[in-house]
From Swiss-Prot:
It is an enzyme of class 4 (lyase). Pfam families: IGPS. Pathway: Amino-acid biosynthesis; L-tryptophan biosynthesis; L-tryptophan from chorismate: step 4/5. The keyword Cytoplasm does not apply. It catalyses: 1-(2-carboxyphenylamino)-1-deoxy-D-ribulose 5-phosphate + H(+) = (1S,2R)-1-C-(indol-3-yl)glycerol 3-phosphate + CO2 + H2O. The lineage of its organism: Bacteria, Pseudomonadati, Pseudomonadota, Alphaproteobacteria, Hyphomicrobiales. Belongs to the TrpC family. The gene is trpC. Gene3D superfamilies: Aldolase class I. It comes from the Bacteria. Its EC number is 4.1.1.48. This is Indole-3-glycerol phosphate synthase. GO terms for biological process: L-tryptophan biosynthetic process. CDD domains: IGPS (cd00331).
Length: 271
């Protein structure tokens, strides 16, 4: 685990402990009982793949540790509507506050504003967070293999499945991919960003994709800025992408989303 992930785990553990006191698990379960069923995150991505279309997990992210505020006029419901109108298959919403200025209500309001399934994008360490995610309306959780032992990842995955949710398992290298493939989820995200150096290289996805059979659905994460980037990864069997910052910075988010997916206009230059 990198120093960055250790620091994040330390503050997340503190957040989790405080949340368990503030909102007991029984209360979360009661809120979940009032939720409509999960929308089917993996199914939405699979439907795009079956039609031969690119599948986009469009991210709603207010800020990042390295670049600060990303979008001054940050409006999660309007962004969700724009992504949906532009052809996105799913949403990814940051809920981590210390590093990304995220919040639970961003997820809840974005999901309420459109028909797309939503991922809780956060650092998951405790099954309590899985119940939180479902109570907030999430349809999928993220497991970052670089921050989790195998037993912890399996326990989090099982908790999500029990709630009818999907699981996106994120990897960056061959060792993490090997571990991810021992889990049950067929959704595997390849992060092209090195968390130690922050360098981004699409070759990471191209290299790791060779380890995966066709029964898995691969997601290219980070470094996808243009339709040409999508076409490049398509050659390695990756037709689903998680993209956020480059879309969030555009004045016309709907048009930028459409351009990324279809190449309809050259308006999505790399940031």
């Amino acid at each position: 685990m990198t120093d960055i992930l250790r620091r994040i785990e330390a503050y997340k553990r503190g957040e989790i402990a405080a949340a368990k006191v503030r909102i007991p698990l029984a209360e979360l379960k009661a809120r979940i009982a009032e939720q409509s069923p999960p929308r089917g995150f993996r199914a939405a991505l699979g439907a795009h793949r079956e039609k031969g279309d690119f599948g986009l997990i469009a991210e709603i992210k207010k800020a990042s540790p390295s670049k600060g505020l990303i979008r001054p006029d940050f409006d999660p419901p309007e962004l969700a509507k724009a992504y949906a109108a532009g052809g996105a298959a799913c949403l990814s919403v940051l809920t981590d506050a210390p590093s990304f200025q995220g919040a639970p209500e961003f997820l809840t309001k974005a999901r309420e504003a459109c028909p797309l399934p939503a991922l809780r994008k956060d650092f998951m360490f405790d099954t309590y967070q899985v119940f939180e995610a479902r109570a907030w309306g999430a349809d999928c959780i993220l497991l970052i293999m670089a921050s989790l032992a195998d037993d912890d990842a399996r326990r989090l995955e099982e908790a999500a499945f029990a709630l009818g949710m999907d699981v996106l398992v994120e990897v960056h290298d061959a060792e993490e991919m090997d571990r991810a493939l021992r889990l049950s989820s067929p959704l595997v995200g390849i992060n092209n960003r090195n968390l130690r150096t922050f360098e981004v290289d699409l070759a990471v996805s191209e290299r790791l994709a060779t380890m995966v059979s066709s029964d898995h659905l691969l997601v290219g994460e980070s470094g996808v800025f243009t339709h040409e980037d999508c076409r490049r990864l398509e050659k390695s069997g990756i037709t689903t992408f998680l993209v956020g910052e480059s879309l969030m910075r555009k004045d016309d988010v709907e048009a930028a989303t459409r351009a990324l997916l279809t190449g309809s206009a050259n308006i999505l230059a790399a940031e």
